[in-house]
Swiss-Prot record:
F(1)F(0) ATP synthase produces ATP from ADP in the presence of a proton or sodium gradient. F-type ATPases consist of two structural domains, F(1) containing the extramembraneous catalytic core and F(0) containing the membrane proton channel, linked together by a central stalk and a peripheral stalk. During catalysis, ATP synthesis in the catalytic domain of F(1) is coupled via a rotary mechanism of the central stalk subunits to proton translocation. GO terms for biological process: proton motive force-driven ATP synthesis. The keyword Transport applies. GO terms for molecular function: proton-transporting ATP synthase activity, rotational mechanism. It comes from the Bacteria. It comes from Thermotoga maritima (strain ATCC 43589 / DSM 3109 / JCM 10099 / NBRC 100826 / MSB8). HAMAP family: ATP_synth_delta_bact. This is ATP synthase subunit delta.
Length: 183
């Protein structure tokens, strides 16, 4: 996924407010909900005829129906986003907010692709591996990919650990091709 520098500025600014108010998780849930609302009615929220105030009012109403309230900083944040026509960056802002939040907690974001739902023991071993190299606790973004057959693929801070059967088969194929070229 490509991240926008503009989205990064919005994400960091909102995270700074969230940290100051000690509401990082609440603000992340707010961004999740706003993204869901926006993505479910993108045509409506991208309509240039509809004023930003009306768009925010609609979001507030929908949030209220989910039992959620918007504080003044969240409302000001959305006002900036919609007035500057940056609503298409909301998902990017949300993802960067989460990434920056992990970093602010002195943890390391790590992608974990695995062929099945990971067991606690597997996660523990993978955490130890990441901790050994990153010197920080990982926060895994787990994706299940049955094409890996078995094993896990962990990526963090430029490191890549591939213990998957699929990865091993690819290495064997590359080595066989190299040997074939050499003979």
């Amino acid at each position: 996924m490509r991240f926008s520098a503009v989205a990064g500025r919005y994400a960091r600014a909102l995270l700074n407010v969230a940290i100051e108010k000690e509401k990082e998780e609440e603000y992340l849930r707010f961004l999740d909900l706003v993204c869901q609302i926006y993505e479910s009615s993108r045509e409506l929220f991208d309509n240039p005829i509809l004023k930003p105030e009306k768009k925010i009012s609609l979001i507030k109403e929908i949030m209220k129906s989910f039992g959620q309230e918007m504080d003044e900083f969240q409302e000001r944040f959305l006002t900036l986003v919609f007035e500057r026509k940056r609503q298409k960056l909301l998902r990017n802002i949300r993802d960067l907010f989460e990434y920056e939040k992990i970093l602010s907690e002195q943890k390391v974001p790590a992608n974990l692709s695995i062929a099945h739902s990971p067991e606690d023991e597997e996660l523990s071993l993978l955490r130890k591996f990441v901790r050994k190299y990153a010197l920080k606790d990982p926060v895994f973004d787990i994706s299940i990919d049955e094409s890996l057959i078995a094993g896990a693929l962990v990526e963090f801070e430029g490191f890549r650990l591939d213990t998957t059967v699929q990865g091993r088969l690819k290495r064997i194929a590359r080595e066989a091709l190299k040997r074939g070229e050499m003979s």
